[in-house]
């Protein structure tokens, strides 16, 4: 088991939310999305997946655009979300600061989307003194896809 050392108050809650309340900030790689959907169709119903990571103030998806679009494809109305304090200084939109979190929020608020994989959100691990993928904050959840196929 891996433990990431970060301020626990960054994760504000884990909730099941209406999928239509979430806001994307970037496009997806279409062939990657279709491959993911095809893969999910091959599973025998039961799936364990990482929750979508979302800003608790803006409802912007921080991590999980392909998962979000796949779940929407299957008609799920409510999905588990790990809400975070996106404005935390421990979170960056990319390892090398090529894009800022405020730029992402501004782009979403303008009604536009970034190109696929324009961001790669990371969180600072105090123990390792390094930035790690923000996916590590995600919670795992179980659902049965047979209800949606």
Question: What label would you give each PLM region?
Answer:
Residues 1-57, 68-149:
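Short, charged/polar connector segments at secondary-structure boundaries
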Residues 60-61:
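Short, glycine-rich nucleotide/cofactor-binding loops
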Residues 64:
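Short, conserved phosphate/pyrophosphate- and ester-handling motifs at nucleotide-, phospho-/glycolipid
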């Amino acid at each position: 088991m891996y433990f990431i050392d970060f301020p626990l108050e960054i994760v504000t809650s884990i909730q099941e939310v209406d999928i239509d309340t979430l806001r994307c900030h970037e496009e997806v790689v279409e062939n990657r999305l279709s491959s993911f959907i095809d893969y999910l169709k091959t599973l025998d119903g039961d799936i364990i997946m990482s929750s979508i990571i979302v800003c608790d103030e803006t409802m912007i998806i921080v991590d999980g655009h392909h998962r979000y679009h796949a779940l929407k494809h299957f008609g799920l109305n409510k999905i588990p979300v790990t809400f975070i304090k996106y404005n935390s200084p421990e979170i960056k939109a990319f390892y090398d600061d090529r894009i800022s979190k405020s730029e992402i929020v501004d782009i979403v608020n303008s009604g536009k989307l970034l190109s696929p994989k324009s961001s790669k959100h990371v969180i600072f691990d105090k123990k390792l003194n390094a930035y790690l993928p923000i996916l590590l904050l995600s919670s795992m959840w179980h659902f049965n896809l047979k209800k949606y196929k």
